[in-house]
């Protein structure tokens, strides 16, 4: 999820461009294997930037996907302030199509291949808590000031809206905007938090540098901050005990290959720092943080995070896999379940 924080402008960040979450790398282990997960990249806009149509002064951005250009994004917004009374939130947006026993977003169906049902919402909640714990209680790493707090914050691909809601509590005088394809955010939110149904994936797959990074740069005023946090899905191992031909590595490699075939690349976190610098951002900081999976870590905090991340992975196995593997390789449900069963037995193992 991406977020942009405007510290001077009084206008909401409607239609603001989004970037990918970058900055922390997390490792997940079953036995002694790990995944590179959340990666955070902080970026500051240079002085003398041209102001975009929806330019913001001091901004920090966070996302789980990417953003489309501000001009097109504004026209596609469906505001979600009151689920019961909002005339703009049509029944078609809330009637989620079902496939493989899971539900998916209805607005611009097919833009995003992961589900949005209760299991997925639970996974997103666990993921958010893991990110926060691995970052030692922080929601962001950009140097935002509570003495000179931001005026506007944009959270792109907000999911269940937990990050946006917490930011609304931290910065009560800021306007917090969260966008997502699915209206699955709660009703009870701080008065300064607003959610919109919007497609941030438009344009992000074909050319991230020009369609996302450059537009995000143009949308920020001098001094603006953008933060992206990415989860890498390549399994790593500290003690070389991970079988490169085993079920976990095979599952991950198949997902990466499927994503590439469908032109939705899963691996680009390692390229973000160079891309952001190339489009003009300065003070670009990349932080890589290891995320354990299950209970192998000796440190009590990391052990707790590891078990939570294992739950997150187990909740996500089918959601990550069905659309990608079926659409890319025409695999049947039975074939996918056989693969997931083998990976499941390793991800949840204890040391």
Describe each model-derived feature in a short phrase.
Residues 146-207:
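Class I SAM-dependent methyltransferase SAM/SAH-binding core
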Residues 123-126, 130, 162, 166, ...:
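Acidic, Ser/Thr-rich intrinsically disordered and amphipathic helical segments
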